[in-house]
Amino acid sequence: MAHVIDFKEAGFDSVLDELEWRGLISQSTDRDRLAEALNGEPITYYCGFDPTAASLHIGNLVQLINMRHLQAAGHHPIALVGGATGLIGDPRQSGERTLNPKDVVAGWADRLKKQIGGILETEGSNPVRFVSNYDWTASMNVIDFLRDVGKNFRMGTMLAKDTVARRLNSEEGISFTEFSYQVLQGNDFLHLFDEYHCVLEIGGSDQWGNLTSGLDLIHKVRGVDVNVFTSPIITDAQGKKFGKSEGNAVWLDGTMLSPYKFYQFWFNRPDSEMENLLKAFTFLPKAEIERLIEESKTNPGAREAQRTLAWEVTSFVHGEEATRQAIEAAGALFGRGGDLADIDESTLEAAIDGMKVDGEFAKVAAGDRVAEAGMKAGLFKSISEARKTIKSGGVYLNNTRVEDEEQTLQEGDFLHGRFVLIRRGKKALGVVEQA
């Protein structure tokens, strides 16, 4: 895992100063009140994660990084996995959510808990505490909910929330189920305040209305002013949210998006994004980030910033060993170090996934000529072109130069008994699979 340092090691006077410099705070309650809370004795804070999919994604990663910064500063984290709210789903910008079966949501909740536990400290003097709002919500009957919780919410305030107002004015409208979500989330904050004296909730900027519901509820029924802050929503180059409901999710679960593809996602970010991404997604000291940003401007071809970003984020999420394998796989594919035989099957399969022809790998067998296999892989238009390129020394079989135009595939050429990599020159790579 990437090395996590506290705000002093990173070059800041306080954790709040660090979070603001990194661009990790979008909106907050009164800044002085928030600073007083974070700069004093350790407080308890929480962030909620609804199990609406089998994995968290990089939009959630921003919140986990915020939690880790606060944890490193000595504050006590609570990770709420929404066993109750996950059955409902918070209102989206457009369209009603599909309600998932209870057993599916419970299974997803277990997976999310495991993911979060792999990122936050779960042992030592300041471990993360896991809670599920199902534990205090499921037993509450409708009458008690309306009398004890619902009476503290005003319709005017609820209707004014951005997402609610937008949905009300849309063609789809909004159901009472999704409209009630903010009441459940507000009650969560109150419960955690009463149970653990939790005085800070964090979330994405699209959650501001839900966060302030709990803020207002605690002020009304307990007479205490607590704090909330949100982080900016991460978007792609087209300004679209990197979220699971948008169809371009970058999952944190290695079985849903391999560590290799996760690494490549970060490595392929453009120079224009380096400053924001290095600040938000790494724990590197301020001075080192500033050096990398300057380096990306003066020597962009070196891609040191991208390489550092990809290493830091991938090792933070997937661990150092999986990250090393991803790096070695990328180098080995094009003969730039590393041995193809050392790449495990799942990493290799992820690395070559984008090299399919018409959605699949061309099928070959031992005894087929390399020239024919190269043509099937889409590297050549004809057998004669393949032979000519072999003759000039420009064809490689699993990174070994092919010397004979009539060379055939051998059983030992198939990596993991399945794949053969054929390269034309330095950059054109094709893959065939054993039939």
Swiss-Prot record:
Its main location: cytoplasm. Keywords: Aminoacyl-tRNA synthetase, ATP-binding, Cytoplasm, Ligase, Nucleotide-binding, Protein biosynthesis, RNA-binding. GO terms for biological process: tyrosyl-tRNA aminoacylation. A motif ('HIGH' region) lies at residues 51-60. It is found in: Cytoplasm. ATP binds at K244. L-tyrosine binds at Y46, Y181, Q185. This is Tyrosine--tRNA ligase. It comes from Bifidobacterium adolescentis (strain ATCC 15703 / DSM 20083 / NCTC 11814 / E194a). The lineage of its organism: Bacteria, Bacillati, Actinomycetota, Actinomycetes, Bifidobacteriales.
